[in-house]
Amino acid sequence: MTTSSIRRQMKNIVNNYSEAEIKVREATSNDPWGPSSSLMTEIADLTYNVVAFSEIMSMVWKRLNDHGKNWRHVYKALTLLDYLIKTGSERVAQQCRENIFAIQTLKDFQYIDRDGKDQGINVREKSKQLVALLKDEERLKVERVQALKTKERMAQVATGVGSNQITFGRGSSQPNLSTSYSEQEYGKAGGSPASYHGSTSPRVSSELEQARPQTSGEEELQLQLALAMSREVAEQSSESVQTARGSKEERLRRGDDLRLQMALEESRRDTVKVPKKKEAKACCKPGSHSQQTTLLDLMDALPSSGPVTQKTEPWSAGASANQTNPWGGTVAPSNITDPWPSFGTKPAASVDPWGVPTTASTQSVPKNSDPWAASQQPASNAGKTTDAWGAAKPSSASGSFELFSNFNGTVKDDFSEFDNLRTSKKPAESGASVPPQDSRTTSPDLFESQSLTSASSKPSSARKTPESFLGPNAALVNLDSLVTKPAPPAQSLNPFLAPGAAAPAPVNPFQVNQPQPLTLNQLRGSPVLGSSASFGSGPGVETVAPMTSVAPHSSVGASGSSLTPLGPTAMNMVGSVGIPPSAAQSTGTTNPFLL
């Protein structure tokens, strides 16, 4: 510690200077080096405090008023004031403008040392620069912004240097001081250039100066800390690299395992599919005896279930062995009635009632397999066909099958459940409710119920008829007229009809307004149409009263005709007038209510 610094500290204690004043006195001391940047930064930060600002400015103005041998006080005060204007509070520049005359007077500062050197030139030049800056507001703003940015940047650098504990060389008891004074200036002032190290960036130099260790022990400590920190950083980086590499290798290994597993699964599926395709191709060859469909191939892949029991479902496709196909074709009996066979079984024979049997059968197929024709009784039982909708015929053999018969209760009727739902009456009662008619006559009305076979005449043929199956709706459909061939017309006993003409059907008295169309035989057998025309236009012809009367309640004759023959008087009138037989027939069936 020099003598000047000891004397300065003694004055600070005696005069009871504040902290801000002590710092200003330290920055503007008479020592042969310039103020440090860190000290000027602390003073600039104190300018934002009102109390410290007044103390700082009072001490600065006091230092500017020195003269003579204390020219360093003046020069350092101008340097500190320039720094405070650029980085301190704005009130510093305002107060400097107010007291600008004090700065302008320093342009005439004179001091010549004992060696004859003019030391006042530095003060004069500095005062001129400061006055020019205070007068130019735009320049002051630009300089202030730039200085603030530099201050912030240097503060960040100083923080980084302090945290990293970077050493910049061996320390010594003599601090490396930086100053803004050039060697030429100090040469003129008689200073030793070796004692002053000029620097273009005094702030960086001051930061480095503070970071340098002062003793050898501190230097060793900083070196050990730096080595430990560098080793820790290297280990962390190596661990992070190894961790990243290991995670990457793990991901690659997992991806390879997953792809390998997928490839194995795909190959296993291919090996399962290839034999199936080969079997399907072999089955589809022309010379193959066992042709299977793709659906059966898929069903073969399923595990085998137990033996399939026969179904009693009335609507199932398979039928029992004692049943015959009602549509004419004979089907070979089969134990398997499930349309979806189990695994490992051969496909059953086709039970399609509309197709031709594919399997070879020892039973001969009858030539006449028309399901709508009248049933015939062949010699052999194998070729029997049964008309499901035809008229009932006595069955002498047990091989015939009647769809609606009950077989005296031995076999359960397929439609008995539906018949029980429709009516609670017995089949005999429902059959008795239908009005009986002679089986030889044809029903004139399509909405009349069909005649039923008498139970007394055929006691052994107790069966279900379509009428009993349909119940009360039997009158809506004439099944015999739709399925069986019409019965041949009975011989007409009407003497007025032409030979070979068909017997006219009874006319409904409520439909007399509709003309009766002539048949083809009537058109062929009728005489010239002129007689009928003359009948309508001849003079003196009176309206012929009906010679017959409709008797709806009369018993029907054996011939099936419901018309009463004309008497002799009517025959004479017809002969005298010349009415043709067809006209006489239509006249004889006139409605008596329309006279």
From Swiss-Prot:
Modified residues (Phosphothreonine): T465
Occurrences of domain ENTH (ranges): 12-144
Sequence ranges of Polar residues compositional bias: 164-183, 197-216, 235-245, 306-337, 358-367, 374-384
Ranges for region 3 X 3 AA repeats of N-P-F: 494-593
One Gene Ontology term from the biological process aspect of the record: Notch signaling pathway
Binding site for a 1,2-diacyl-sn-glycero-3-phospho-(1D-myo-inositol-4,5-bisphosphate): R8, K11, R25, N30, R63, H73
Localization, UniProt: Cytoplasm
Region of interest (6 X 3 AA repeats of [DE]-P-W), ranges: 313-389
Family matches, as Pfam families: ENTH
List of residues that carry Omega-N-methylarginine: R170
GO terms of molecular function: lipid binding
Keywords: Cytoplasm, Endocytosis, Lipid-binding, Methylation, Phosphoprotein, Repeat, Ubl conjugation
Post-translational modification: Ubiquitinated.
Residues recorded with modification Phosphoserine: S173, S192, S195, S443, S526
Region annotation (Disordered) ranges: 164-254, 267-289, 305-396, 423-469
Stated family: Belongs to the epsin family.
Job description of the protein: Plays a role in the formation of clathrin-coated invaginations and endocytosis.
Domain note: The NPF repeat domain is involved in EPS15 binding. The DPW repeat domain is involved in AP-2 and clathrin binding.
Name of protein: Epsin-2
Biological source species: Mus musculus (Mouse)
